[in-house]
Regions:
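A short helix-loop-beta-strand connector motif used in the catalytic cores of GNAT acetyltransferases and
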Residues: 47-76, 98, 115
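C-terminal "cap" of GNAT-fold acetyltransferases
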Residues: 164-175, 180-197
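Conserved donor-binding loop and adjoining core beta-sheet/short helix segment
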Residues: 29-51, 79-81, 88-101, 105-110
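Conserved acetyl-CoA-binding loop-helix of GNAT-fold acetyltransferases
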Residues: 116-121, 127-144, 174
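Conserved N-terminal entry element of GNAT/NAT acetyltransferase domains
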Residues: 1-45
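Conserved acyl-donor/pantetheine-binding loop and adjacent beta-alpha core of acyl/acetyltransferases
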Residues: 65, 69, 83-119, 126, ...
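Conserved GNAT acetyl-CoA-binding A-motif
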Residues: 135, 142-163
């Protein structure tokens, strides 16, 4: 199966069961220590929350609430177009203001930036350009929402696929993103203009 054989759909409250099924059964079969996140980390207020003290159930409930109220958005990749096709990938992307947990400093252009926080691809589907298809869908969706830029947060290098949850730098640069900031710990900010100035 290739990216042209998969279906990519925006996460909506109606697709919450698909999101939960993906995270419960396929997302982290090779890296169970990440399973408790439920992709809530970028949304948490780290000034008031001690992340390591949060339980999987707390993060699951918080993500469910955010999905239901529209403050956690993104795209799901499905293994085909059949109604019962399982979700095999996820990209957390939406307004930058929804993922302030990733930032230490305010961004003056935040209201014009669509942020791509993370990718999760089921292990059996890695290396098949699913993340690239999700990135393309995220950029198209963010452009349609009126954002001027898409922003991602890869690391300069990643030891393995399980650690590349922000997406590999090479994927972003191939899609036209440019590095605009480098952190001392190897974290990067990459940005792509979505609309003409």
């Amino acid at each position: 199966m290739t990216p042209s054989d998969i279906a990519i759909e925006p996460l909506t409250p109606q697709r919450l069961p698909d999101f939960l099924d993906f995270f419960e059964h396929r997302a982290f079969t090779d890296n169970p220590r990440w399973q408790s996140c439920w992709c809530h980390f970028p949304h948490a207020d780290h000034a008031t929350v001690v992340w390591k003290e949060r339980s999987s159930a707390e993060n699951r409930a918080a993500s469910c609430t955010r999905i239901e109220n529209g403050t956690m958005t993104g795209w799901l990749a499905y293994a085909g177009t059949a109604p019962d096709a399982p979700a095999i990938g996820w990209c957390n992307a939406g307004p930058r203001r929804f993922i302030e947990g990733l930032f230490d400093e305010p961004e003056p252009l935040a209201d014009r930036i669509g942020a791509i926080a993370c990718f999760v691809i089921a292990p059996a589907w890695r290396g098949k350009r699913i993340a690239t298809a999700l990135l393309d869908a995220a950029c198209a969706g963010l452009r349609a929402q009126g954002f001027a830029w898409a922003e991602g947060y890869p690391r300069a290098d990643t030891a393995n696929a399980g650690e590349a949850h922000h997406g590999p730098l090479a994927m972003y640069t191939a899609a036209g993103f440019e590095v605009i900031k480098t952190e001392p710990d190897g974290g990067l900010t990459v940005r792509k203009r979505l609309v003409a100035p």
